[in-house]
Amino acid sequence: MVPFLRILGIETSCDETAAAVVERDAEGNARVLSDVVLSQLDEHSAYGGVVPEIAARAHVEALDELIEEALNRANVSLDEVDAIAATSGPGLIGGLLVGLMTGKAIARAAGKPLYAVNHLEGHALTARLTDGLAFPYLMLLVSGGHTQLILVRGVGEYQRWGTTIDDALGEAFDKTAKLLGLPYPGGPAVERMARDGNPDRFAFPRPLVGEARLDFSFSGLKTAVRQAAQDIAPISDQDVADICASFQKAISRTLKDRIGRGLQRFKTEFAATDEKPALVVAGGVAANLELRGTLQALCDKNGFRFIAPPLHLCTDNAVMIAWAGLERMATGAAPDPLDVQPRSRWPLDSNAETLIGFGKRGAKA
């Protein structure tokens, strides 16, 4: 039987600095003792996006105090923690260095094992913390850096069924917002404007709809938005609302097709499974209510459970990093050496095909 375990998690892969303490009992039940997140929204809003150097400096300034706060809120000392888990990739290399080096230093000083966690694995396993979900299941990750459909077979066992061939969905939201003069972050701003818009005014493209493969593409949709805005310039607030509503509708229809095909494939490959199949959604874009509604209806139609963890666990956080570390410990996985290096590009499925367009450095994730 797996013993009781407690772990300190650290997350610094992008523009949130986070620390958390999570414990797991012998039966696999989780308890979050603390969850501290410091957003860098104010630091980056003037630039309309994340500036890597500013992000790294902000992590340096905040991380030590956040870790201390996480331990204090959990009412535990480092001596009462069994291991350290720190995000090691993928993400912005400066931020990853800050978090991983801090994790290494704590592990060495306190004599604790270190687990270098793949950020995407944190997202992939969160539903097991919140809902006790059994393997296998599908996960749709939709964020500023990633759009992927992943089969989660087990801890450390992932198969990428689909990914974006160009822009991530969150990136498309942010760039559309910037184009229309909306504030950063773009996703919530586009969603707010869309509530007062006409979703049928603009017939935006729905990339890859109808294709058998399960990949995504959003670059062409972003270009179509730019062209529509130029064609009717100068644009009014109502024009912006209509563009946002039409943009969201195109994305909803695209996801309905792409994910619908994924659900059918899952049912075919796991026809003998007695458990009701599940689709998990994670990432900041998962907060969008229209997209959630589309996915919920799609799951209802296909006999799937739709699982969306609480928003604070969908976006970047250290709870998921701690939990991923606990899951690895529970399988008996060995800790990482203290000379482990961060990886800005770290595909969750190491056997996945590299798509055209990623360049010499390969796929980020």
UniProtKB/Swiss-Prot annotation:
EC nos: 2.3.1.234
Enzyme class label: transferase
SUPFAM superfamilies, sorted: Actin-like ATPase domain
Pfam family, one: TsaD
GO cellular component terms, A-Z: cytoplasm
Keyword Methyltransferase included in the entry's annotation: no
Domain of life per record: Bacteria
Molecular-function GO terms, alphabetical: iron ion binding; N(6)-L-threonylcarbamoyladenine synthase activity
Cofactor names: Fe(2+)
Keyword terms, alphabetized: Acyltransferase, Cytoplasm, Iron, Metal-binding, Transferase, tRNA processing
Biological role: Required for the formation of a threonylcarbamoyl group on adenosine at position 37 (t(6)A37) in tRNAs that read codons beginning with adenine. Is involved in the transfer of the threonylcarbamoyl moiety of threonylcarbamoyl-AMP (TC-AMP) to the N6 group of A37, together with TsaE and TsaB. TsaD likely plays a direct catalytic role in this reaction.
Protein's name in the database: tRNA N6-adenosine threonylcarbamoyltransferase
Protein's organism: Rhizobium leguminosarum bv. trifolii (strain WSM2304)
